[in-house]
Amino acid sequence: MINRRTIVLIPTFNDWEAANLLLSDLDQALADRELSPEVLFVDDGSTQPMPPGFADRPFTTLRSVDVLQLRRNLGHQRAIAVGLVFVYQNLPCTALVVMDADGEDRPADIPLLIAEFDRAGQLGNPGSIVFAARAKRLERLSFRALYRLYRVIHLLLTGDQVRVGNFSVVPFESLAKLVVVPEIWNHYAAAVIRSRVAFRSIPIARGKRLVGKSKMNFIALLLHGLSAFFVYGDIVGARLLIAIALALIVEVLLVAAGVAVWFTTIPNVAVLAAYVAAILGILLLQAIPVALILVFTVIGSRVNAGFLPLRDCPYFVSSVQRVFPCA
């Protein structure tokens, strides 16, 4: 592989044991790949302090390990956004790898992403972000069912499929575009897709957690999904208005059918149609203003000066600590 400066960005919250194990896996997985990455953990306001001796051991591949400490807990996606801006402003590189600290993003798959990154450059697309498309998930059945339901709802409301997560390789020229995309504050992958930044994906199976259990539950999945929907706010609002318009047509047809049936002396069916039309009408009266408020709120937010990651993310950085090599 060609010589390059590679940064590995890893957000973490109270997951120090897994993060420490991940460093060893990174060092071993990349030992024969001519990669000497610099690792940057983003400490998302952990309530548990970094344990003594974290990353305090010799590495053969890793060039350095730093911990970017945030002033407060922001959440996984926003920690990634702060990390992206920090790397752009302070660590100019050829490629930035974004991955999670729990081990489900396997270090052994980084060379596959880098190889696709190189292939994109050879094909004349050097600015393409390369995502890992999840070919297989290992979570429990209930979570997989909820996730499948989320994917269906996401497709219906946004028109885009949920294909990728955080695990990716970002060229520096694409990073320069992402740091001015406000939506990365809510959802990294959705922001990339919505902003039309060039990207591609390759199928990669999800790994197992190194230690402990996944913190992703129904509430966390719901919040994660809502963050993605917010990125598509205008599209979601427009699709809801279309759905309401179709429902209004059905309402009119039901009323017309009820009147027609009434005059053909089938009163029981007419009464049933009237009840259905009344219930649907009440629901529509509540849905119409909600959809209109959503659409105009999103459109109005484009006029006002909003959150700009490049300008605002540095406010959340507390300090940077070098943990390897020790001073």
How does the language model describe each region?
Residues 35-46, 68:
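Short beta-strand/loop segment that forms part of the nucleotide-sugar
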Residues 5-7, 38:
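Cell-envelope/extracellular polymer assembly enzymes that use nucleotide-activated donors
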Residues 70-72, 76-86, 104-186, 208-209, ...:
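Acceptor/aglycone-binding surface of glycosyltransferases and processive sugar-polymer synthases
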Residues 43-52, 103-104:
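A conserved acidic beta->alpha catalytic loop
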Residues 238-324:
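Membrane-embedded multi-pass helical conduit in multi-pass membrane proteins
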Residues 92-104:
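Short beta-strand-to-loop acidic/aromatic patch adjacent to the donor-nucleotide binding site
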Residues 15-30:
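Short, well-formed alpha-helical segments that are part of the catalytic scaffolds
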Residues 176-236:
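Catalytic donor/gating beta->alpha subdomain of glycosyltransferases that bind UDP-sugars
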